[in-house]
Amino acid sequence: MENEMKHSNDALHVVMFPFFAFGHISPFVQLANKLSSYGVKVSFFTASGNASRVKSMLNSAPTTHIVPLTLPHVEGLPPGAESTAELTPASAELLKVALDLMQPQIKTLLSHLKPHFVLFDFAQEWLPKMANGLGIKTVYYSVVVALSTAFLTCPARVLEPKKYPSLEDMKKPPLGFPQTSVTSVRTFEARDFLYVFKSFHNGPTLYDRIQSGLRGCSAILAKTCSQMEGPYIKYVEAQFNKPVFLIGPVVPDPPSGKLEEKWATWLNKFEGGTVIYCSFGSETFLTDDQVKELALGLEQTGLPFFLVLNFPANVDVSAELNRALPEGFLERVKDKGIIHSGWVQQQNILAHSSVGCYVCHAGFSSVIEALVNDCQVVMLPQKGDQILNAKLVSGDMEAGVEINRRDEDGYFGKEDIKEAVEKVMVDVEKDPGKLIRENQKKWKEFLLNKDIQSKYIGNLVNEMTAMAKVSTT
């Protein structure tokens, strides 16, 4: 089947254009690799400063090419900063300003390349109109779960132009929202969601960017499946009156290379499935109080743990740890606890037989990695779509547990950490722990089913081929 697809779709040409954040670039790369295996020609747009890293992530294929983009000068944007990884959240907003100034450059490239489709991201609200004028179809590729789009950015959220919702409005789902486990959100979560309606540097709000993109595109592509999010997918389809193509949740390839020896040696000391691995992504910095309560909560489980903490650039990590961690903590846990700052081989660690639990920020890719590696998922979401990921996984999928937090400000204590971990690691013979562990195994089996994965990509290629009216003869 795949060989037939390869032969028949040689002519299909797709431009992929993610926002300049690796949390967005990575899903675009994963999809590019899948499409190239079906013989689809891919031109990958990214800032020149990101090109070498993107190249290392893309599979080598004669039909895949990187197109480096030149970022214009923007007051306040440091020279050479071409992804959110090098910027604070406030300065990262300037990347959207830069992107908006790149429209002439993008139009020239698209006029020259003449692809059948552009797969674009949330920030390029102007792209559908531009591409349409050039006779090019556009697909809005949503890298967040469908629940996030359904709850936050559907037209039903703003029923009158520019009359944005209040804090109380954001606690409730929008009009017509399907009946699911998500019936409300907490005050601190709703407050975080209000970011969607803020304007930065006199630019469009995130909500308005997403609306323009979704309303203007030819079709919507979602990194999800009906088994996980059926009601939300139907709601999004009805709200925008557009076809929604699905590619299923993207399961990462098994890690290449061996786990660093010092970590492998340490993990090998413990019984299978007993170690807690804990990390919150590269762009999350916990407060001193959060570090303290998290560390004490992990200690109180009595289980071995590997805690990865991130700190802003140019700070003294040792000094930060000494200030944030309780006095005597490192000495107390030296035999069964590791506190590390910096990059680690996360996939390799989750795949290690000793690791049985992942305490995380509920980034959906991280959750998928945990589920397929037989790790129980304990979630402490930090912002935005992570909050809704956690509700999907703990509520609709019943495949993880969310750490309890105070409604007003999101405070959590060591007891909340301990209680959540023990549900899935200690009290495993009674619900909810028993049910969650059973569901983890079911979702693992589903996610690793290669026939299902291939079917989604094959269907997408067929749909795009039909839309583009590419000759398959």
Swiss-Prot record:
Keywords: Glycosyltransferase, Transferase. The keyword Protease does not apply. InterPro entries: UDP-glycosyltransf_plant, UDP_glucos_trans, UDP_glycos_trans_CS. Gene3D superfamilies: Glycogen Phosphorylase B. It comes from the Eukaryota. The keyword Protein biosynthesis does not apply. Pfam families: UDPGT (PF00201). Pathway: Pigment biosynthesis; anthocyanin biosynthesis. One of its GO terms (biological process) is anthocyanin-containing compound biosynthetic process. Its EC number is 2.4.1.-. GO terms for molecular function: anthocyanidin 3-glucoside rhamnosyltransferase activity; UDP-glucosyltransferase activity. Expressed in petals, styles and anthers. Controls the rhamnosylation of reddish anthocyanidin-3-O-glucosides, which is the first step in a series of modifications that finally yield magenta or blue/purple coloured anthocyanins. Controls the conversion of anthocyanidin-3-O-glucosides to anthocyanidin-3-O-rutinosides. This is Anthocyanidin-3-O-glucoside rhamnosyltransferase. It comes from Petunia hybrida (Petunia). The gene is RT.
